[in-house]
């Protein structure tokens, strides 16, 4: 765990480090000593409310800082429990939890912290950065974006479909590095659709009432996803829903959710969205749900153009065996962490740095 790793290595990390001194400065010596920044503010999101609150807090406190945490108001029970447990072990001037709505978060981001950590959407991250800049507070922003998933013509479709489904449907797609859209070679649409349906059925034999299949966080976000689908359909997209309880069968558009019982439980079935284009909101906004738009391509240059036309993503996924093609794509695109023939690894590998570029 992060806590165990930090405790094991903290003494070495904090140890003063001697550096070489130029001859003309002898007999002087020089060393680097690390010291705490002071008070670190943390604004954590709702999608992983423990990990993304306590992870930054562990790092900040290990470095000797005090922490003020503003957890998300969309997970009030988790936030209340965090405040209760933290209050049992820390004094308020060591580790404080501030609860409240978006207005409280806005005021929180304008406090004169020595450092401010924010995890959330790009739109809110911009507002946080502007507020922090008024105090000249340095920030660490972990945002998101539309992480592309590229399937090459030589990829193992069944393996790719299973790993893409896992990455897409973990927490019902409410993960900052979930595959946001798929780039698929023309001619492989039916084969991938069948493989994806089979993979989803293997992971989730049913959706409604299945405690292993996550719900969308609230009705507002559920309604937003519904609007994305309806707008895409109105603009010519074709939505294929994976029918609940039908195993590997790929449902037709006629079996779309009723938006009744599903909406009440907020368990939106997975769907592949075909025939999408860049003018659709579903291709402009980070989806944060179990919807996977698919773009068919003929040449890798089309893939490069599609990725570079948008904000730089937090993650990029490549499925294929041709190393030259893979390296060509990676040289010509800019993103955060890259995973080859799998998904979600940028956050799963504890010894790799995690972060994005630009808007991510």
Residue ranges of predicted features:
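ALDH superfamily catalytic-core signature
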Residues: 90, 123-277, 300-301, 340
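N-terminal Rossmann-like NAD(P)+-binding subdomain of aldehyde/semialdehyde dehydrogenases
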Residues: 1-31
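A generic structural signal for well-ordered alpha-helical segments
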Residues: 60, 132, 196, 232, ...
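Rossmann-like NAD(P) dinucleotide-binding subdomain of oxidoreductase/dehydrogenase enzymes
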Residues: 19-159, 297
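Conserved C-terminal structural/oligomerization subdomain of aldehyde/semialdehyde dehydrogenase
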Residues: 150, 256-360
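Residue-level signal for inorganic ion chemistry
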Residues: 3, 64, 95, 116, ...
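Short glycine-enriched loop/turn motifs at secondary-structure junctions
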Residues: 109-110, 143-145, 175-177, 210, ...
